[in-house]
Swiss-Prot record:
It comes from Pisum sativum. It comes from the Eukaryota. Root nodules. Residues 2-146 form the Globin domain. This is Leghemoglobin Lb120-29. O2 binds at residue 61. The modification Nitrated tyrosine is found at residues 24, 29, 134. Keywords: Cytoplasm, Heme, Iron, Metal-binding, Nitration, Nitrogen fixation, Nodulation, Nucleus, Oxygen transport, Phosphoprotein, Transport.
Amino acid sequence: MGFTDKQEALVNSSWELFKQNPGYSVLFYNIILKKAPATKGMFSFLKDSAGVVDSPKLQAHAEKVFGMVHDSAVQLRVSGEVVLGDATLGAIHIQKGVVDSHFVVVKEALLETIKEASGEKWSEELSTAWEVAYEGLASAIKKAMS
């Protein structure tokens, strides 16, 4: 079964909720660093700070990550596959030392952040929609890394 219109709508509506509050970007990186403190140096906007400090670069990167997952949902519904819009993503992830376990951490942080942003609209169906979209993106990045 492919990605459905309803799943895309769920991702769209919660993506809008995420974008309304810049605090969710800080939450996202706090969750990542709590789960995998060693990843701090992988992010240029975090490596020289004492912790997660809100900044334009942090906001831009979080919006890019969540935006790419959102775009993946659209691609999955339309064509059933995710094609990276940025051909350098594989090389960047290799350069930063990203390994499979990092993709799991980011997925968990993404889902926890969307759960917080969605509030009472959170459901297993919403979680699954984001998870499938993220897995599509992660698979495309991993393919570009090989």
